[in-house]
Structure formats: structure tokens, C-alpha cells
């Protein structure tokens, strides 16, 4: 009761000392196991996980098959999850013959641990758990989700070396909740790397499957530019016209589409069509694109003479 009173006032140190006295003075009483349990809980609530584990494991070892033992096991599981050491929990259970945890259950607990860290935006711990999961559960039930969490964590950390393998796993599965995000990420990466053939392929696939209007517009625009820079002018013209056929587009998207049309026709040698779109750009934009379009219009007129 003294220990409980200390806990009520958030004096965990005094509470632990009081519970320890009960354990030492009355080791065979029911109060002892309850007190030892409360010591473990006090350490756990105070974020002293190593001391909590020590006391909770003593509860399990000294008072098996009791309510306190079962409660202690649950908290031990939580601590190992908080530490991102879920395999150590499985090893502890197996070593002490406390239960038989099926592979499916281990798979599920490992995934939930990863999911918890990802929800907290703790990308380093998410990656640690994801790598362990992918190494152990090569046919796991949550492979798609784990690859996605690894992908997003690497993106959040700004690391690109490992990210592609996770993206490719996601996009090589049947279309799923993560496909849009993965395709958009890999398309942007390849576009920035000037790998326009690849970025065009990914943008085209994304435009075909996405149900999000903003993503669809970005995909068509990315495809348009990728095809243009890959010298595929008929495709860039096709994509530019797709953008202009959409009612709700921004002024910048309208300028970009007309500019790509003008440049594509110019590079094809169709100066009459090119002039038409350069003139549109001159009217729409008063900055660099407008100025360049004005100069290019003069070149078109010269070439048409």
C-alpha cells in the first residue's frame, strides 16, 4: 500500500524501494509477486527498459502460470518491440520454453513493430526492422508493405542507393495501394537522372492507372517532357495535346504544353505548326519562355521564307 501511494504521487523511486522491501521481506507471499510486477511496471513507465526487463523476467521465472506472469510477458513483448529487437523476444520465449510462437505469429509481430516505427516517422528504426524482416521472411505475408515502408523511409532519409530495389518490388506486383507512389518516385528519379526513356515508361504507366487528378497531370507532363528530351517528338506532341484537352490545368501547365508542342514541331522541321505554338507561348508568358518563344518565332518565319 505504501508503494501504491508513492505511485499515486508519481514518486516512482520511493515506490520501487517500497516494493523491493516487500519482495525481500515476504518472498513467498502473493504480495511479493505483485510487488515485483509493480517494480517492473514502474521502471517501464519511467523508460528504464533494461531494469524493467530484468524485473519482469524475474516475475515470469519465479511465478510461472500466474496472472502477473502473463502480464509480464505482454510487457516484455512491448519492450522488445520498442527497442526494435523483436527477434530477441522470440529467442527469449524459445530459450525458456514459455510458449510456441508460430512463424505466422512471428511474421505478424515483426511487421507490427516495423509499422509502429514507420507511423512515428522513425525511418532509421523502420529500415532496421525492414531489413531484418526481409532477411528472415523471404515469403512473408507482409512483403509488399515492408518494401513500401523501406522505400518511404529511404526517401525520407534522402538515401538513393538502396531505394530502387524496394520501388521495383512494389511496381512489379499487381497494381496495389502503393503503386502510384512508387511509380511517381521512380519516374521522378529517372527524369532527374536524365534517363528519359525509363522515366517516360514509368510516367506513361502511372498516367494510365492513377485515379488522382493531380498525379495524372504530373504523370502526363512528365511523360511529355521525357519523350521530348528522348527525341520522340510524335509522343511528346501527343502528350502535350492530352494536357491541353484537360479543362482544369494551371497556367504553367498550359505554357509548358504549348512550349513542348512548339519545340517538338520545330525539331521535326514543321515550322508552320511550330510558329503557331511559339506565338501562343509569347502571349501566355512574359518571362524566359516567352522571350525565347519570341526569338524562335522569328527563326520559324525566316525558315518559312
Question: Where are the regions that the model predicts?
Answer:
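Acidic, polar-rich low-complexity tracts and alpha-helical solenoid repeat scaffolds
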Residues: 1-305
Amino acid at each position: 500500500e505504501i508503494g501504491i501511494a508513492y505511485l499515486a504521487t508519481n514518486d516512482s523511486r520511493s515506490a520501487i524501494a517500497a516494493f523491493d522491501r516487500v519482495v525481500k521481506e515476504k518472498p513467498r507471499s502473493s504480495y511479493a509477486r505483485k510487488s515485483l510486477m509493480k517494480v517492473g511496471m514502474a521502471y517501464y513507465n519511467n523508460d528504464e527498459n533494461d531494469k524493467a526487463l530484468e524485473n519482469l523476467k524475474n516475475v515470469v521465472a519465479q511465478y510461472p502460470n500466474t496472472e502477473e506472469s502473463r502480464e509480464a510477458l505482454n510487457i516484455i513483448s512491448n519492450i522488445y518491440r520498442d527497442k526494435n529487437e523483436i527477434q530477441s523476444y522470440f529467442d527469449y520465449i524459445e530459450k525458456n520454453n514459455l510458449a510456441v510462437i508460430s512463424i505466422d505469429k512471428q511474421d505478424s509481430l515483426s511487421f507490427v513493430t516495423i509499422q509502429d516505427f514507420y507511423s512515428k516517422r522513425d525511418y532509421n528504426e523502420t529500415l532496421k526492422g525492414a531489413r531484418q524482416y526481409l532477411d528472415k521472411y523471404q515469403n512473408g505475408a507482409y512483403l509488399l508493405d515492408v518494401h513500401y515502408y523501406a522505400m518511404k523511409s529511404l526517401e525520407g532519409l534522402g538515401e538513393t542507393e538502396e531505394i530502387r530495389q524496394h520501388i521495383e518490388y512494389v511496381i512489379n506486383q499487381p497494381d496495389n495501394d502503393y503503386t502510384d507512389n512508387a511509380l511517381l518516385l521512380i519516374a521522378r528519379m529517372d527524369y532527374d537522372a536524365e534517363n528519359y526513356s525509363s522515366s517516360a515508361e514509368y510516367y506513361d504507366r502511372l498516367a494510365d492507372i492513377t485515379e488522382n487528378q493531380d498525379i495524372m497531370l504530373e504523370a502526363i507532363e512528365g511523360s511529355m517532357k521525357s519523350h521530348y528530351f528522348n527525341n520522340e517528338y510524335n509522343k511528346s506532341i501527343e502528350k502535350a495535346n492530352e494536357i491541353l484537352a484537360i479543362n482544369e490545368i494551371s497556367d504553367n501547365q498550359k505554357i509548358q504544353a504549348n512550349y513542348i508542342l512548339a519545340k517538338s514541331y520545330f525539331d521535326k522541321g514543321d515550322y508552320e505548326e511550330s510558329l503557331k505554338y511559339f506565338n501562343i507561348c509569347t502571349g501566355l508568358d512574359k518571362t524566359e519562355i516567352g522571350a525565347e518563344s519570341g526569338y524562335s518565332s522569328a527563326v520559324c518565319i525566316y525558315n518559312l521564307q
